[in-house]
From Swiss-Prot:
Region of interest (Antigen-binding cleft), ranges: 19-197
Region described as Alpha-3: spans on this chain: 198-289
Protein name in the entry: Major histocompatibility complex class I-related protein 1
Disruption phenotype: Mutant mice lack invariant MAIT cells due to impaired thymic selection. They show normal development of T, B and NK cells.
Organism: Mus musculus (Mouse)
Membrane topology: Single-pass type I membrane protein
Ligand binding (2-amino-4-oxopteridine-6-carbaldehyde): 61
Tissues expressed in: Highly expressed thymus. Expressed in liver, kidney, spleen, heart, brain, lung, skeletal muscle and testis.
Length: 341
């Protein structure tokens, strides 16, 4: 069974040069909590930056970003502390309800993700979904005001939730209007952090991965925002079917990393190059003819190319698990309120 913690949430980012922003809230209930994992956790993110947190140990909603603490009054935190204490009890009851219907005992998890995205062209998206033991359980479709059930238990929940038209419309309005309004507000609070630009360091590596098979890697790291476009070109033409892609993932220092690779016959005379675009900055690196790396460092003042003979450079790859959650047979009576929690 997979245990997913919102505090460790990793977001995959679309491989694109179009800048987007998102607001997400995760809730997690655990049936058998311990000293490391609380019974209930709620965490909020703008993009990949934690902004709020609450858990069943502290029983307080608290800011995780200084620009949240500076801009929201104490009564905001107290109001949503009270709401989350209610959600804590609701999630605990709902998880027990699910365990009974699945005939489960022991350690199990119940998760919820709600949020929205603001795209560069001004368009928006919204999402609300739930999971049990890390697997999709039920997903809200705001356009049809309906729920997509993933199994027989979720289908019972679907029938109950779809009977409450007021709640369906409320969720749609929250996703399309209130969530976006709060996202724009938070983006203004954290402008210096969220609107900054750090261009990537890009490296190409040639390595024999199997006898008779050579792999070219193109790696980018140290960039923000996370939207980036990377492609391999062969003899001047883009290739896609032969390419393996890594996710765009946090590096742990407020920047991101990603990679892509392509296999080839080492006897081939084809010329491969990696093309990278990030926030209007374009970089092109040819694949090395011999084992080693070609490193390009992109800075605000210009681009410097360094040739470095390095072998076997590793990269930490994070794999994203879905962050979802919730289920119940009667729609919850704990209202989200005018602000996300």
């Amino acid at each position: 069974m997979m245990l997913l913690l919102p505090l460790l949430a990793v977001f995959l980012v679309k491989r694109s040069h179009t800048r987007t922003h998102s607001l997400r809230y995760f809730r997690l209930a655990v049936s058998d909590p311990g000293p490391v994992v609380p019974e209930f956790i709620s965490v909020g993110y703008v993009d990949s930056h934690p902004i709020t947190t609450y858990d069943s140990v502290t029983r307080q909603k608290e800011p995780k970003a200084p620009w949240m603490a500076e801009n929201l009054a104490p009564d905001h935190w107290e109001r949503y502390t009270q709401l989350l204490r209610g959600w804590q009890q609701t999630f605990k009851a709902e998880l027990r309800h699910l365990q009974r219907h699945y005939n489960h005992s022991g350690l199990h998890t119940y998760q919820r993700m709600i949020g929205c995205e603001l795209l560069e062209d001004g368009s928006t998206t919204g999402f609300l979904q739930y999971a049990y033991d890390g697997q999709d359980f039920i997903i809200f479709n705001k356009d049809t005001l309906s729920w997509l059930a993933m199994d027989y238990v979720a289908h019972i929940t679907k029938q109950a939730w779809e009977a409450n038209l007021h709640e369906l419309q409320y969720q749609k309005n929250w996703l399309e209007e209130e969530c976006i309004a709060w996202l724009k507000r938070f983006l203004e609070y954290g402008r210096d952090t969220l609107e900054r630009t750090e261009h990537p360091v890009v490296r190409t590596t040639r390595k024999e991965t199997f006898p008779g098979i050579t792999t070219f890697f193109c790696r980018a790291h140290g960039f923000y925002p996370p939207e980036i476009s990377m492609t391999w070109m062969k003899n001047g033409e883009e290739i896609a079917q032969e390419v393996d892609y890594g996710g765009v993932l946090p590096s742990g220092d407020g920047t991101y990393q990603t990679w892509l690779s392509v296999n080839l016959d080492p006897q081939s005379n084809d010329v491969y190059s990696c093309h990278v675009e990030h926030c209007g900055r374009q970089m092109v690196l040819e694949a090395p003819r011999e084992s080693g790396d070609i490193l390009r460092v992109s800075t605000i003042s210009g681009t410097t190319i360094l040739i470095i003979a390095l072998a076997g450079v590793g990269v930490l790859i994070w794999r994203r698990s879905q962050e979802l959650k919730e289920v119940m047979y009667q729609p919850t009576q704990v209202n989200e309120g005018s602000s996300p929690s």
